[in-house]
Every structure is written in C-alpha cells, then in structure tokens.
C-alpha cells in the first residue's frame, strides 16, 4: 500500500555535461587560407539549465520579480472583481517521471494579508514540462479557494498510479470547540487539472467549552452528556498500489476513532475514479461534521 503521508519520491537529478571542442596545434604556425577565414564559426552547444533555474524563471514570469523558491513574497490576488494583498509561497514542488519523459508539479499557496476568519486562502496548481531553457505549462488550475482565516491550508504531491501524479490539499475550520479538517484531490484529467473530490481528514469536538475540563469529579449527568456527544475521528487516505502497473490505483480511506457514546469506529472505504466525470463518488458520511 502507498500512503500519501510517506515522504515524496526522491527528487530526480537532471544534469548535463558541456562538451568542449579544441584544435590540435599544427607543427608549424601557418596562416589560415582566406576561404577558411570566411567560414562561420561553429555554433556553441546549448548551455545546460538546471531544474531550479527553470522553476525560478517560471515563478518570476508568472508572479513578478519578487517571486522565489523559498520563503514568501508579497503580491496581489484578484477574485470576484476585488484585488487584495496576499503573501505567496511555493508550498509543493516535485519532478515526476511520466512515460519516457518527465514533468514538474508545482503548487503555489496564497495567504490573505488581512484575511478574516471566514476568508479562505488560495492555491494555484501547475503541471510543467521542459521547453527551451525554461518550463512550459501543460495544465493549470488557479483561483481555487481553501482554508479559513485567509490561510489556504497545506498542499502535497501524491502518486495515484503507475505514472499518475497529482496534489492533495488539507485545510480546515476551527471554531466553537470543533475541528473540521478536509482533504481534496487535484488530479490531471482529459481536460487538464481538476478537483476530483473532497472528504474529511479529521473531525472532533474535543474543545467544546462545556466539556473541555470534565473529569472524574464532574457532575455525573454532565460527564455522561459530554461522553455521549464527544467524537474524534480520522480519515486516512492512501492508494492501493498492489497492482503497481495499473495506470490509476484505487483510492482507500480508512475511518478510525471514537464516535458519540464512546463507540469505536474502524472501517475501510474503497473508491475508483469515474472515467466520465473524473471524480470520486464520496458519500456524505465522509463529509460529515459530527456523529453519524
């Protein structure tokens, strides 16, 4: 089984060797013939451009001169005819092998500078391929909203098939004692990058005010009420890679934890990507906010 929590695949190194051409000196210096002097000089071999240099050039061209591979830079984001200040940063990047070539996956996260609690952040996704001395865009998905408080959550790169890669986003909402975390899969499809579905990654009400400090000395009725209503459940996402040659691997979600009344939960859900809609048919129970 291949879990998305495992460290990303080792970054591929692409290096080139510059070839140097030289002439052996003649035994005696002899003036070159006039015809030879008129010949055009042989073209120099193309200089190797590193992957990081290509990435930096793409970021600068897309986001401006302040964009960088490491750390934040200030920019702007226009959505619904409103332009707001935003702090951008690269939140996931990895080269991947696809067939007999390679691609560069890139996610750029944006956090609103003055985001209110209800405001989401944004993440922009790119699949790039080498083109000349830079990168060309094979597919992109921009303007996607995630998270709260102006923060977009986190992005990671996943392997979902033999040579099929995409992105996983985890974001959440916290309030009134509840934690509601979700995970979204963004995968390349026939029409480019697309959001294929959204499910919970974790839910709990551990910080509910009236139950946060309940202990053995608490009123029995209060303690029982809190125990009845308390829940904490994880939804771990991974891909079934038992057939490693399969183009797209089945998706597994393992639901574990405690539901209301202290009942233990442990069950596995299995899904396949619909080839027509390019989505996973997740049930509402995997998007719930509390006990079933």
Predicted feature descriptions by range:
Residues 10-21:
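Bacterial N-terminal signal peptides
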Residues 98-103, 131-132, 158-165, 189-192, ...:
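Short, solvent-exposed coil/turn segments at beta-strand boundaries
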Residues 22-78, 175-292:
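Acidic, small-residue rich beta-repeat scaffolds with periodic aromatic anchors
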Residues 1-12:
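Bacterial N-terminal signal peptides that target proteins for export
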Residues 82-160:
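Short N-terminal edge-element motif at the start of the domain
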Residues 148-195:
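Contiguous hydrophobic, core-forming segments of folded domains
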Residues 103-113, 163-172, 246-255:
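Short beta-strand elements that form the blades of beta-propeller/WD-repeat-like
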């Amino acid at each position: 089984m291949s879990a998305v929590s495992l460290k990303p695949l080792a970054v591929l190194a692409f290096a080139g060797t510059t070839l140097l051409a030289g002439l052996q000196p003649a035994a005696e210096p002899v003036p070159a013939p006039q015809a030879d002097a008129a010949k055009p000089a042989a073209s120099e071999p193309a200089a190797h451009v590193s992957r990081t240099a290509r990435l930096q050039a793409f970021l600068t061209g897309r986001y401006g001169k302040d964009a960088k591979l490491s750390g934040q830079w200030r920019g702007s984001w226009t959505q619904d005819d409103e332009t707001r200040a935003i702090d951008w940063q690269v939140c996931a990047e990895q080269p991947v092998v696809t067939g007999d070539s390679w691609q560069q996956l890139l996610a750029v996260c944006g956090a609103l500078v003055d985001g209110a609690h209800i405001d989401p952040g944004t993440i922009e996704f790119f699949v790039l391929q080498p083109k000349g001395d830079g990168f060309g865009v094979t597919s992109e998905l921009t303007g996607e909203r995630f998270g709260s408080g102006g923060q977009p959550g986190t992005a990671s790169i996943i392997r979902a098939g033999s040579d099929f890669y995409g992105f996983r986003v985890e974001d959440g909402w916290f309030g009134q004692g509840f934690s509601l975390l979700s995970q979204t899969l963004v995968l390349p499809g026939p029409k480019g990058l697309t959001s294929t579905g959204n499910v919970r990654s974790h839910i709990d009400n551990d910080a509910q005010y009236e139950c946060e400090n309940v202990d053995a000395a608490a009123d029995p009725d209060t303690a029982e009420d809190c125990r009845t209503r308390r829940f904490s459940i994880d939804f771990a996402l991974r891909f079934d890679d038992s057939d490693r040659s399969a183009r797209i691997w089945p998706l597994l979600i393992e639901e574990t934890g405690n539901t209301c009344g202290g009942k233990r939960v442990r069950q596995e859900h299995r899904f396949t990507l619909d080839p027509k809609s390019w989505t996973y048919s997740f049930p509402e129970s995997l998007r719930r906010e509390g006990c079933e």
